Swiss-Prot record:
This is Putative protein FAM157B. Residues 1-21, 60-84, 177-255, 326-350 are annotated as: Disordered. Residues 177-186 have a biased composition (Basic and acidic residues). Residues 74-84 have a biased composition (Low complexity). It comes from Homo sapiens (Human). Belongs to the FAM157 family. The gene is FAM157B.
Amino acid sequence: MGPLFTTIPGAHSGPMRPLPKKHVEPMAVRQLLLGNSTMIRHTCPMSVPLSRQVKEVAAQKPSEDIYKNRQRRQQQQQQQQQQQQLDLLFHQRIQISLWPRKQKRRKTEQHSHPFVKKAFRFSAGPGCRRPSSNKMLRSMGGGQRPMGLGSEFFRLLHDLHLLAFATKRIWIHRRGEATARPRAPEHPAPPATAVRGRDAASQNLKRRPGSGTDGLRLQGAEPSRLLRTYAGGAVIPTGTPERAQPPPPQDPLGRRRWLSRNTWGPWPGTTQPPSPQLLRNDWGSCGFMVPEAARGKVFQDSQEGAHIRRETVSKSVCAEPWRHQRARDPAPTNFPLKCQKQRGASTSSGQHGGRVNLVFFIDSPTVIAVPDLQCPTKYSGILY
């Protein structure tokens, strides 16, 4: 009898036996004889035999031997079929090809096994054959390609797990499945000029040898697709030079655009250039030495504010230089402040050593001086 399970190398191992037939007669005949029609309808809808057989079985009396009758009937049918085949062959009404390229399969003959079902799917649906008309060719979606036996064969191998591709399945153009998408062009085409008339519809189609623009060109006329128009629609005469394109915008500071992937100029880690205000007032970042008069005040007067700024900048005591990209964050929590003892800065000694955090507003002359309690707070010297 041989093994029940056979393993093809590379394939999934499964029962190598035919699937059960759709029409299972003995059960149906038995139930017909019992006369229970509801049971037939509920238990086995697929196993109800053809109506002719039902009539024959119902016409028999239950005492007759059904199985003998059926055997006799099968023999008769086989003989009839053989006779018909011989007749056909003899009269040569049929051409026999050993392996037909395409077979029409009825739905009932399709196997219920998932791999096999997927392999035979190519024979159904409109997406597989060549487009029959021009209109279909235009309206067709992207993924449909006409294909010959080659791809069918390879897809069959693939679906039966006899063929494994590590790459994307580029060769399968089936609707709704993963296909390789076309890359976007690096330099997109310039926008098309205004096109009027029937050429507007066919503008995006590939030109075929019979199309209208070729006919026009053969007659010496220029197709309207190639005519440039003004904004109002008037045709620009051929030979007019195009307006010169403006040169690409230069970098304002004239330095190389990208030193590495994410840098701008000499400030590493920043994508944007620092604002000109930041470049002008390049303060130190942490504890500022301020005259006693400035402590805790808000300066509205521009001259006084500017004076405080100047004095503060000249006396700033801090080891950490200002990082320019921090100016974009309203409250950076993470920049390291190495606050040092005052190096001989003359201040009147106070509760916190005369150290004050100034908050500068870049757009206005306002300066807020806030005394700090622990050496500088982590918000010291922030620009708002």
